[in-house]
């Protein structure tokens, strides 16, 4: 049964590292120091031993040895022994791991403490450096302050020194000038006394010299007079006695006077004639009258105008049927008046802006075979005193036309205002009087056509000189459609089909679109519709492909309508508050 106690077990099985010895008991050291007399004797040691346990163990070993499960029991004992050894080894490993962990923790703590120590040392170094820098800055600032105070003190001392030196210099100069003045006064006084003394002493000599000079001067003058009289007398006597010389002299003086007077008046007359025939008055902005300078500059255009036939008065002018019939009668009457060399009638055309007044005046002149001249009423007031002369020049120039002249005054209400109620300057009043004087009677040389947006502001004398009043109202739906079609053809279709211009029109119903535009542009004038067509052309040119689409036309129409509404709002705001509830004047909207 020796295997049960591990005495005869196989080597290498279940053996592990030796277990650590238990720590010595506190009393072991003291027990080792006891004397030999204190040790118990062998007899006493085994006197209390009970062998019963050993007997039972030996008996159990013999039974187990003879048992058939002896080998399993041995293996079980060995496995238990190995398990215990493994447990001891794992505990040992845990102990070693704990020791290593404790060492690593100690290292980490030491590193943390060292890091904290380094951080604290760094912070202390930084604080010390900042404090030293602060002290250095304070020392530097103190040095600067001390240096500034020292500089200020030196500057103050220098200024005081300069002031003292300046005061000393000024005092020195004043003293020097005072002494010089005293010396000068003494010198002048001495010279005056010496001169007076010399004059008193030489008074008789001076009087004698003056008397001799006067006598000599008188004698010289008398001799000169006698000599000149003798010469002139002899010459006049010789001239009078010779009648041929007298006659020639009188004739020469007469011819000289006549020549000077004739040259002066001839130059003035020639200048006025050249100005009236060749030039153009300053008030005339545009004219179809041909001048010599224009013929020299543009001979081909002038020749075409000379051979051109009279045009239709309403070509390119779209009006309502009633207004068209009336203005056609005026055009026919004007043409027949020119043929019969009768007196022209004065016409007033009033209505909103952009309704075709200026265009009809030009067409009327071309239809009648007359020249036209356009002047603006706003150009008269700035001329001041020259306005009267300029107005007479205009009518003198108009009277020299061989074909007859249609004088169109645009914005005539700018200077033909009421003299009784309106506050106008004296120069403008004189210009108005000159205009009334030149238009007091009808003429067979020129026809006066006035255009105004506010005819109620005319002076009563102007109304008395008007023979025919024509109201140009805003176009209605039919006229607007005709205008839209005409300008669409002029500014869009013709540029798209003629030439090499970068303009194309998308495929849509042009007639239907023109009707829609005419419906949307209610209240707009012919000029606004023309501007709308020009805007279509500009939008097509500004597009990437140069194509005018229906959407682009609609966008421009909406913009034009909004702008027209904004203009109407401005027109309402411009009126006085007392007239805010009243509708606008008929001349601003319709007739």
Swiss-Prot record:
Residues 31-47 have a biased composition (Basic and acidic residues). The chain crosses the membrane at residues 246-263. InterPro entries: AAA+_ATPase, ATAD3_N, ATPase_AAA_core, P-loop_NTPase. The modification N6-acetyllysine is found at residues 490, 494, 512. It is an enzyme of class 3 (hydrolase). CDD domains: RecA-like_ATAD3-like. GO terms for molecular function: ATP binding; ATP hydrolysis activity; protein serine/threonine kinase inhibitor activity. Keywords: Acetylation, ATP-binding, Coiled coil, Hydrolase, Membrane, Mitochondrion, Mitochondrion inner membrane, Mitochondrion nucleoid, Nucleotide-binding, Transmembrane, Transmembrane helix. ATP binds at residues 351-358. Residues 2-49 are annotated as: Required for interaction with the inner surface of the mitochondrial outer membrane. It catalyses: ATP + H2O = ADP + phosphate + H(+). Residues 2-245 are mitochondrial intermembrane. Residues 289-304 are annotated as: S100B-binding. GO terms for biological process: antiviral innate immune response; DNA damage response; HRI-mediated signaling; mitochondrion organization; negative regulation of apoptotic process; negative regulation of PERK-mediated unfolded protein response; regulation of cell growth. SMART domains: AAA (SM00382). Gene3D superfamilies: P-loop containing nucleotide triphosphate hydrolases. SUPFAM superfamilies: P-loop containing nucleoside triphosphate hydrolases (SSF52540). PANTHER family: ATPASE FAMILY AAA DOMAIN-CONTAINING PROTEIN 3, PUTATIVE ATP-ASE. Can form homooligomers. Homodimer formation at the N-terminus may be regulated by ATP and is required for the interaction with the inner surface of the mitochondrial outer membrane and correct mitochondrial homeostasis. Interacts with components of the mitochondrial ribosome and with other proteins involved in mitochondrial RNA metabolism. May also interact with protein involved in lipid metabolism, including STARD9. May interact with FAM210A. Interacts with GADD45GIP1. Belongs to the AAA ATPase family. Essential for mitochondrial network organization, mitochondrial metabolism and cell growth at organism and cellular level. May play an important role in mitochondrial protein synthesis. May also participate in mitochondrial DNA replication. May bind to mitochondrial DNA D-loops and contribute to nucleoid stability. Required for enhanced channeling of cholesterol for hormone-dependent steroidogenesis. Involved in mitochondrial-mediated antiviral innate immunity. This is ATPase family AAA domain-containing protein 3A. It comes from Rattus norvegicus (Rat).
